[in-house]
Each structure stands twice: as C-alpha cells, then as structure tokens.
A protein has these predicted regions:
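Beta-propeller domains
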Residues: 1-17, 152-173
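Short loop/turn segments that connect beta-strands within beta-propeller blades
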Residues: 8-11, 64-68, 127-130
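Short strand-connecting beta-turns/loops that link adjacent beta-strands
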Residues: 10, 36-38, 128-129, 165
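Asp-box/WD-like beta-propeller blade repeats and closely related beta-sheet repeat scaffolds
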Residues: 18-121, 134-151
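A structural motif corresponding to the C-terminal end of an alpha-helix
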Residues: 121-132, 162-164
C-alpha cells in the first residue's frame, strides 16, 4: 500500500512518502501524524526483517516527510498518544486470527495462539526510544471479572484509544 498525504494548500496534491506491506482493510497501516513532535512526522506499521522481535516481522516506522529521515521502532502501533511521546501496541497476528480485517497475516500462518498469555497484551512503547513495557496482559484481562464461559476463548483487544491529555486509555476486551 502507498502511504502519503494530500497537500490541501497546493491543490490537494497527493505526496507519496513510502510503501508498506503491513495493511488491513479496516485500519490500513495505522498511519498517524505525530503532532507532538517537531516538523512534519508520521508513523505507520510495516513489515520488517526483524525475526527476533516481540512480534517477528512487524514494527513501525517514523518518517520526517520533509527530510525523508526514517527510523524503525520494534513494535507495530495501534494508537499514538496525542503528545506523540508514546504508543500502545498489540500483536496484529493475534488480531488476524480473531478478526481478520483488523490484523496482519503472516507467512505460513495463521498459527495457533495461547489463549490468554501472561507475557502479551497491550504494550506501552516510547516513540523516541522504542522501549516497551507490558501494561495489561491477556491473562490479567481474562481474570478481571472472570467468566468461565471465556476460559477456552482466545483473548484480544480492539478500539484502543487515548484521551486528549494522553493520561488515560480505553479499549474493548
């Protein structure tokens, strides 16, 4: 998929910036402007050659649209805080299994997934450094107001949002 922007001050001219292989029907590549950073920077998800990352083969890319400078972050983003300081991240391969139109396929997949792992869920990633920490594991979400009917279900989240002051999040589980 081509990523770019329309210049509304120049006849709505489209400026292609980059191509991505991480795209889905409902959310595209999660392309977002980083309004909290200097200049005109955007972030989007992409496929990577990183086979040793948290989510092998997927990450995100920050691009300065004026200079063309790019840097890769180790996790794909779901939403970036309005401050542009951090992003919330999930496993798009899990989303592909649970809801194909909002996930990313992987070569040879989809593969079997743990139902509610302790070491995966919603991640908080610093946009400046790529450092990440797990905010809420699927195991914790499963245990919250536990329902036995969900014991054999694959747990996942969607509709993750950050409030305007970047101080709270919400999501559906």
């Amino acid at each position: 998929a081509s990523i770019g922007y329309f210049d509304t001050e120049n006849g709505d001219r489209f400026h292609a910036v980059v191509e991505t292989g991480a795209w889905n029907w409902q959310m595209g590549s999660q392309l977002q402007w980083l309004d909290g950073l200097e200049g005109r920077q955007l972030i989007h998800n992409d496929r990577t050659a990183d086979s040793g990352g948290r989510y092998p083969g997927f990450g995100s890319v920050v691009i300065d649209v004026d200079s063309g400078e790019r840097r890769t972050l180790p996790m794909p983003v779901y939403v970036v805080a309005p401050s542009s300081a951090w992003a919330l991240c999930v496993d798009y391969r899990r989303l592909y299994v649970t809801h194909e139109t909002i996930g990313y396929s992987e070569e040879g997949g989809p593969f079997a997934l743990p139902l509610a792992p302790e070491d995966d869920g919603i991640w908080h990633m610093e946009v400046a450094t790529g450092e990440a920490r797990l905010l809420a594991s699927y195991a914790r979400l499963k245990a919250f107001h536990h329902r036995t009917s969900m014991d054999k279900a694959i747990h996942w989240v969607s509709h993750i949002e950050v409030n305007p002051s970047s101080s709270r999040i919400l999501f559906l589980h």
